[in-house]
Each structure stands twice: as structure tokens, then as C-alpha cells.
A protein has these predicted regions:
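Conserved beta-alpha junction segments in alpha/beta enzyme cores
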Residues: 171-232, 330, 334, 455-487, ...
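Glycine-rich loop/linker segments at domain edges
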Residues: 8, 14-17, 86-90, 158-201, ...
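Flexible, low-hydrophobicity surface segments
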Residues: 1-158, 269
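Extended active-site and interfacial segments that coordinate phosphate-rich ligands
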Residues: 16-17, 126-135, 139, 219-221, ...
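Thiamine diphosphate
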Residues: 249-271, 275-277, 496-504
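Short Pro/Gly-enriched beta-strand edge/turn motifs at strand-loop
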Residues: 83-85, 176-191, 276-283, 451-460, ...
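C-terminal catalytic domains of large/alpha subunits in multi-subunit enzymes
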Residues: 69-70, 233-238, 267-274, 303, ...
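Short acidic, glycine/serine/threonine-rich loops at helix termini
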Residues: 76-81, 124-127, 225-227, 250-256, ...
């Protein structure tokens, strides 16, 4: 009998094709008669456009046309569609596909050049002359919130996009009876995410069929189709969106962008395919960015560290526009109270416009921000009350017997936040055991005696993964006998093709490699939302399971009729159905599938629908909560400010583990992302002019493989009761607690200097400044 696929480290099915250079990314696609487009982008962070002179560009040989917003007729009056609208939004400002009369960040598109090839298009774009009337810039969200602040949009009353409240419990009572109240402020940087593949789009229009086909490097083909249809006022069935191989997503590719819309309109206008590939500089200037928030926090607690309540004000920098609604803001407040049973929370998040690139969710969305605040606050309590950091966390955890646990908070749709399953205390114990935490403390003390500054960091988290409501899947047996899985979801390197095959294969007694998988094509796949928020394994995964189960049941019923027996007498292995009592009596899936394909004078058996196939949608109104705890060991050189990462341990609970190797890969990648956020990545702007400063990979630093510690991973499985596989998300679990854990370790290493670290990233220069400031305070 075939061994089960789910739960085993099946080698990635994608790798053979991708490693041999057989992948098919957007830039690998070239269509007959294709044109290239390039954008003329704003060199000012805030200005009025007085004039745009395109004459020289239009005169260049090989240029097909140069277009401004006014050249698109009635559509010029329409701004981009707002994703995720909310009644909390005061100013639903989205950008026009090309600037109307005002630019609000460096890199905003003003005009577009279409030419016979990219080289000509780039040269022509350089010939377009834009005359600006500069306006004051606002680059700091806190300054944007001031009553006398300059305006990011000249016709707006102020810079406040929205205010998001998040509260439950009696916060006044919690603070009134608390013997201890501590206050802290935290700053979290703005960063960029650098997928190996930048964005790109190709649009083709078939005038005879009135059909649009769009290839785009996206995490959300169905959402792109929806927004294109809404903007163009076309039926969705007249638009096909394909996500081919996508070289990394991490969140920014979940949004829809002006470039997709402009390419589509030009393809219709010119009746020729249009291609645009983003270069790395454009990526720095235009692709949505991450994380930029200021927090002022108060915590009320008892003398033993038990937290009674937390209140906070967050000032969130959303950049110049609001393309993705309040999703990033909501995911910054909704994680509270984290892994802890805290009875009262009161948070206000002010979402501010600034003259910077818009921000949207990036790996973890707002959860790393919230977890940083929560975990640093736990460290503050331990430090101020001279308590053990571990005991403070254990004292406040939601306990195993409390699941399912209602926090008291409610989503905007009125559904209460409920943690479905887990054992947070055990997960922390596991990582302490794996890291030999008590021995780590001894090692740090011994190192200190030699003048070596080592520290240990701790952080715990939980994560709402598998976001509702659905992700569809179709499973069918082809007449050849091959099992075929179609998903509207698409992969950006997570290994979705592999886990889809593993789940389906188990229903037919096959190896994962026997399954064909197709992803991310709106013309043939079941409806889908997006590959975001660690959601596909716990939404599409159960849908694959349910669809495969339905196909299996249909095959059993048909085989039972074929053998003239009851269904419970039939079994399956290696794609062959047989009688349990007489294994030699058998019929293949191929033969069964052929029975359900009608032909001339050939009918489908009575009582059966055509095709050995099924489409399923696992639907849910609640997220499933993954969780974990991390420990980091670091060494700090107080002469240079350099931080060396010695070891990193992860205990992780994502419910049923479909593929341990893939989960480990996701965790390792997530930790690397956290290292980048904590120590290296910082998108800097000139505060007076709004000009971006770190616009290449020599100035904007990413972590290298040589800077990575050994990452030790252990799994705890507490299956979720909310889906038939028991799975939870894993894609962001390395990043969400990682930043807090690393900063905690660095602060611990610098205990002799009484350094307090409430911000990131920690460059060597910043760390040296903190050490010197602490020394001065000590002397004073």
C-alpha cells in the first residue's frame, strides 16, 4: 500500500523545472507584435504639474506614442479602485493611473511612453520634460498629524486618512487598580521588500472576441481581474488574468497597481500587446512599502507581572495614498492581546498620509509591529519589576484549557476574535528546552567575565492565518487517469504545487509526483481571493481535500456499480480501485473516468454526472491561529556596534504539518526577513525634500547568507478544529516574532550599560549611539 503523503517531507515538485531554467515568468513571455511601455515618473515628492512637453519623445524613431492621463478620455476622471473599503476611512484617496495635476511622491507616474522596444521607450521617457511647481512635503507621520501640518494633498482638509479603534474590557478600571503602570514609546522603520523578480505585466486584447488577457506578476489574479473589470466597466468573464511563475511576492504583489491598468488600456487602444517590466530603481520608488509606525504605550500590571490592561496610540504612515484600504492598519491592532489573556485593551491607530510611497501589508502585515510592541512591553515589565522574562510570559499566557479563547475583541463585521487551539506555554517550554536556555544564561555570564557581550532574546506570538472566507479548488481525473488539481491561488515560491499534490494524492493512493497542478488562471480555476496572510494551506488545502474526497467517493460509487457490490467493499491504491475481498478484481481511475465521458451514442451511466471531477470551497468565518516562541543568542561588539547572530531557535505550531521541509523553509525565510528588518533594512527619505536616499542595494542593505545564524526548528502540532486538515498558516511565523526576539537579545547583551532599545533597524552607528547615551546617563 502507498505511504501517506501529508506529513512527509516530499521534495518540491516545482524545483526540477525552476532550477533548470524552465520557469515561465512574465519577462519570459514575448508575444507577436508586442510593444514596450515605460513611465515618466515624478522627480518631486510634492508638486503641481504646470506642463508636460512630450514633443521630443514623440519624435524619436520607434516611438508609437506618449500618453498623459487626458489621453484616456472619460476614464481620466476616475481614480484607482479602493481595495477593502471601510466606513472608518475619512478620506478614501487613491491615485490616478497617471497623475492628474498633482504629484504626491517621488516616482508617481505622470506619462507613459510606448515604443517598439524597451530601449527606445527608456530613451524617449528621458526626453519628456515636466515643469513642476514644488509644494511643501510631509515625510513624518507624527508631523502629518499636527494641526498646523502642511497638506500631503493640497485639496484635503488634513492628513488623517482614518482612525481605527481597537478596544475591549474596562480599561479605566484596569489602570485604576494597577499597582504598576509603565510607559514606553516605540518606532518601527519603513522598509522595502525585495522579491528576486520585480513587478511586470503584459496585456493583450483580442478585438474580434472583445477579450482581454493579462499576464501579471501578482499574488491575486482574481482580485486584479475584479479591479480591472470594475474600472473598465467590463464583465469579468471578458478578462482573463494569469499569474505565471512569480519570483517572490511577500505582500506588495497582492495589491493592484496603475501599471496593470495602463497596460490594459493601451492594449485596447493600440490593438497590440503591451509589456512592462519594473526595474530595481522603479521598485524602490513605486512598489508599496512596509512597517512605518510610531507607538506610545501604557501597561497596567500587578507586582507579579500579571497584565491587567494595555492602552496605546499608534501613528501609522500610509504614504501618499490608500490603495489597500485599512488592511495594514487592522492587522496592526487586531493581534492585541497576542498570546496573552489580557482583560482590557484600548488602542487608537491614526492612519496618516505622507509624501512617500504608499504602504501595504508585507510579510506579517501589521503583526510584526504589534508583536514587537507586545513582546517589548513584556520585557519592560520584567526589567522594571526585576522579574524573570520567561515567568512573566508564562504568567500571562492563554492557557491550554482556555481554548477556544475569546479575547473580547470584535472584527468590524461583528465576529468575535477567537483563538481556536494551541498550547502557548508548552511551545515556549519546547524552545527553552531545545535551546538549553539555562545553559545559555551561564554562557552569557561567562562571556561577560571575558569582556564579551552576549545576550539572549525571547519572543512569543500568535497569528491569525487562513483568513476567511474561502479559496476554491477543482480536482478531476482525466481520461488518461492523471489526477489534475486546479487552484485560483498562485505560488510565489512557497511550494503550493507540492502541498496541493500531497493533499490530493492521499485520496487516490498515489505519489505526489503523480498529480498535475495548475495555479493562478482565472479562466479555468475555481474562485479564489489571494495568496496572502499565510492563508492558502488552511483555505485552499481543505478545499483540495474536500474536492478530492468527493471525486474519490464518486469513483467508489462508480466502481461499486461496475463490480455490482456495495461501496464499502471497494478500496483504492496507486490509482486503481479493487475489491477488498478479491484484490485481483480491479478497475483503474482512467477506465472509470472514460465511463463518465459521453460520446456519440455513448451515454454517461445513469445517476452520474459527466466527468470524474469536483469543485469545492472550504468556507469559514474565522481565522485559525498559529503560534510559536523564539529564542535568539547574539554577540555585540561594543567597539564597532556590529551584531553577530550566534544561534536562533524556533518552536512553531501550525497545526497539522503538511510538509515539514516546506514549513521549515518558510520559517527560515521568515527569520531571515526578520533579521533584515531588525538590523539592516531602512528606506530613508530626505525630510525636507522627500527625495528617497536608499535607492540601490549598496545603500539599502539586505542580510547575507554569511550573516545568518544556525536556525534550529522544532514543531508542535495542535490541529485546528476549524478545517478538516487541522492546518494553520506557516508563511509568516518566522518574521512576526523575529524582530522582537532579536532586539530583546541585543538589549540583553548590553545590560551592563542599561541600554534600552525601543526601535529598529539597529545599524552599528545607531547601536553605538545608544551605548554612548547610556554611558552618559550612568555618569550623570
Amino acid at each position: 500500500m502507498h505511504t501517506k503523503n501529508v506529513g512527509t517531507p516530499v521534495q518540491r515538485l516545482e524545483d526540477d523545472r525552476l532550477l533548470r531554467g524552465k520557469g515561465r515568468y512574465v519577462d519570459d513571455i514575448d508575444l507577436p507584435d508586442q510593444l514596450a511601455m515605460m513611465f515618466v515618473r515624478s522627480s518631486e515628492a510634492h508638486a503641481l504639474i504646470k506642463s508636460v512637453d512630450c514633443d521630443q519623445a514623440r519624435a524619436l524613431h520607434g516611438v508609437i506614442g506618449v500618453y498623459e492621463l487626458k489621453d484616456f478620455g472619460a476614464l481620466a476622471d476616475k481614480p484607482m479602485i479602493l481595495a477593502n473599503p471601510s466606513p472608518l476611512i475619512r478620506q478614501p484617496i487613491t491615485q490616478y493611473m497617471l497623475a492628474l495635476d498633482e504629484v504626491c511622491y517621488v516616482g508617481q507616474a505622470i506619462a507613459v511612453v510606448v515604443a517598439e522596444n524597451r530601449y527606445i521607450a527608456e530613451d524617449a521617457a528621458q526626453l519628456v520634460v515636466v515643469d513642476y511647481e514644488p509644494l511643501p512635503v510631509v515625510m513624518d507621520a507624527r508631523q502629518a498629524a499636527m494641526t498646523n501640518a502642511h497638506l500631503v494633498h493640497q485639496n484635503s482638509p488634513d492628513n488623517l486618512a482614518a482612525t481605527v479603534p481597537w478596544k475591549f474590557g474596562d480599561i479605566d478600571q484596569a489602570f485604576a487598580k494597577a499597582p504598576h503602570i509603565f510607559k514606553e514609546s516605540y518606532y518601527q522603520h519603513r522598509g522595502v521588500v525585495h522579491s528576486m523578480e520585480c513587478r511586470g505585466v503584459i496585456a493583450q486584447y483580442d478585438a474580434q472576441l472583445d477579450q482581454l488577457t493579462v499576464w501579471t506578476s501578482t499574488q491575486s489574479p482574481y482580485l486584479v481581474r475584479r479591479f480591472l473589470a470594475q474600472f473598465l466597466e467590463r464583465e469579468e468573464v471578458a478578462i482573463r488574468v494569469i499569474a505565471p511563475d512569480v519570483g517572490g511576492g511577500f505582500g506588495p504583489k497582492a495589491a493592484h497597481y496603475p501599471e496593470e491598468l495602463v497596460a490594459t488600456l493601451l492594449a485596447i487602444k493600440l490593438k497590440r500587446p503591451i509589456k512592462w517590466i519594473e526595474d530595481r530603481l522603479e521598485h524602490f520608488l513605486t512598489t508599496t512599502q512596509q512597517r512605518d509606525q510610531w507607538w506610545d504605550v501604557e501597561v497596567a500590571c500587578e507586582s507579579d507581572g500579571h497584565v491587567l490592561g494595555m492602552r496605546a496610540v499608534c501613528t501609522h504612515d500610509n504614504g501618499a495614498y490608500l490603495p489597500y484600504g485599512l488592511l495594514l492598519c487592522m492587522t496592526s491592532v487586531a493581534p492585541f492581546p497576542g498570546s496573552y489573556a489580557i482583560g482590557a485593551i484600548d488602542i487608537r491607530l491614526d492612519c496618516m498620509f505622507t509624501n512617500a510611497v504608499p504602504t501595504t501589508p508585507i510579510r506579517g502585515a501589521g503583526r510584526p509591529n504589534a508583536t514587537f510592541v507586545i513582546e517589548r512591553t513584556m520585557d519592560t515589565i520584567a526589567r522594571e519589576l526585576k522579574l524573570d522574562r520567561v515567568k512573566v510570559r508564562q504568567r500571562n499566557f492563554v492557557q491550554k484549557e482556555q481554548f477556544p479563547y475569546l479575547t473580547g475583541a470584535k472584527l468590524p463585521n461583528g465576529i468575535g476574535i477567537q483563538y481556536d487551539s494551541g498550547d502557548y506555554a508548552r511551545c515556549l517550554d519546547m524552545v527553552l528546552e531545545e535551546s538549553q536556555y539555562s545553559q545559555l544564561e551561564i554562557r552569557c555570564k561567562e562571556a561577560a567575565q571575558k569582556g564579551i557581550y552576549r545576550g539572549i532574546g525571547i519572543a512569543s506570538y500568535n497569528e491569525d492565518s487562513g483568513l476567511p472566507p474561502y479559496e476554491g479548488a477543482t480536482v478531476k481525473v482525466l481520461p488518461s487517469g492523471k489526477v489534475y488539481v486546479e487552484l485560483g491561488s498562485c505560488s510565489q515560491g512557497q511550494g503550493l504545487e507540492t502541498i496541493a499534490a500531497q493533499i490530493a494524492a492521499d485520496q487516490f493512493g498515489l505519489h505526489a509526483g503523480d498529480i498535475l497542478v495548475k495555479l493562478g488562471d482565472t479562466i479555468s480555476s475555481a474562485m479564489a481571493l489571494s495568496t496572502v496572510g499565510s492563508r492558502v494551506a488552511s483555505t485552499a488545502g481543505p478545499s483540495i481535500f474536500l474536492a478530492a474526497q468527493a471525486v474519490r467517493q464518486k469513483a467508489f460509487k462508480l466502481a461499486a456499480e461496475h463490480f455490482n457490490v456495495s461501496e464499502n467493499e471497494v478500496n483504492i491504491n496507486a490509482g486503481v480501485l479493487f475489491l477488498k475481498s478479491m484484490p485481483d478484481k480491479k478497475i483503474s481511475l482512467a477506465d472509470l473516468a472514460k465511463k463518465l465521458v459521453a460520446g456519440v451514442m455513448v451515454n454517461v451511466p445513469q445517476g452520474f454526472s459527466p466527468g470524474l471531477e469536483s469543485t469545492a470551497y472550504h468556507t469559514t468565518e474565522r481565522a485559525v491561529y498559529a503560534n510559536g516562541s523564539n529564542v535568539a543568542e547574539v554577540e555585540v561588539d561594543i567597539q564597532t556596534g556590529e551584531v553577530t547572530l550566534l544561534n536562533y531557535w524556533v518552536a512553531h505550531d501550525c497545526g497539522t504539518v503538511i510538509n515539514p521541509a516546506l514549513v521549515n523553509g518558510q520559517i527560515i525565510g521568515g527569520v531571515v526577513h526578520a533579521v533584515g528588518n531588525a538590523l539592516f533594512e531602512h528606506m530613508k527619505f530626505d525630510q525636507d525634500t522627500g527625495q528617497p536616499i536608499t535607492t540601490n542595494l549598496g545603500e539599502y542593505l539586505l542580510p547575507l547568507a554569511t550573516e545568518m545564524p544556525k536556525i534550529h526548528i522544532t514543531h508542535m502540532e495542535s490541529p485546528s478544529p476549524l478545517n478538516p486538515l487541522g492546518v494553520k498558516g506557516a508563511g509568516e511565523g518566522g518574521t512576526i516574532p523575529g524582530i522582537a526576539c532579536l532586539i530583546s537579545a541585543i538589549e540583553d547583551a548590553l545590560k551592563p550599560f542599561h541600554v534600552k532599545i525601543n526601535e529598529y533597524p539597529l545599524s552599528p552607528e545607531k547601536l553605538l549611539c545608544l551605548i554612548e547615551e547610556a554611558k552618559i546617563r550612568t555618569v550623570a
